[in-house]
């Protein structure tokens, strides 16, 4: 998913590049979760940005000792569809790009869906923090992530 808030020409280039390598890119809109749910139920691999809240309606998590907002989408999709939720972190090395996958984050047995999504999203943040501390230069963040730091 991506936001088409980019200038039209830049968004088209972004879209064209990803589609040429076999990706289906979904714009962020009201049908996105329904489309993603259908793809998940049909066994498709879905990659979602999980370290930045583009919707401004994210879940508050503890990240490096400060409150940050992460998107609810990855955990919500897993709760609603039963799809496996895995984290991935990209590291750039002299020998190329390495992608580190974490073990599955399971849907908690207890709590309502909102509590389950919050707990799973905090686990995503915890795993991301662990990798971020190893190689902070590999994190490309252009948005404000910690509101309390000004």
Where are these regions (language model features)?
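A conserved, positively charged/aromatic
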Residues: 18-19
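Non-catalytic C-terminal accessory region of glycerolipid acyltransferases
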Residues: 31-150
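Nucleotide-sugar donor phosphate/pyrophosphate-binding loop at the beta->alpha transition
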Residues: 8-15
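Short acidic-hydrophobic, aromatic-tinged amphipathic segments that line or gate anion-handling sites
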Residues: 24-28
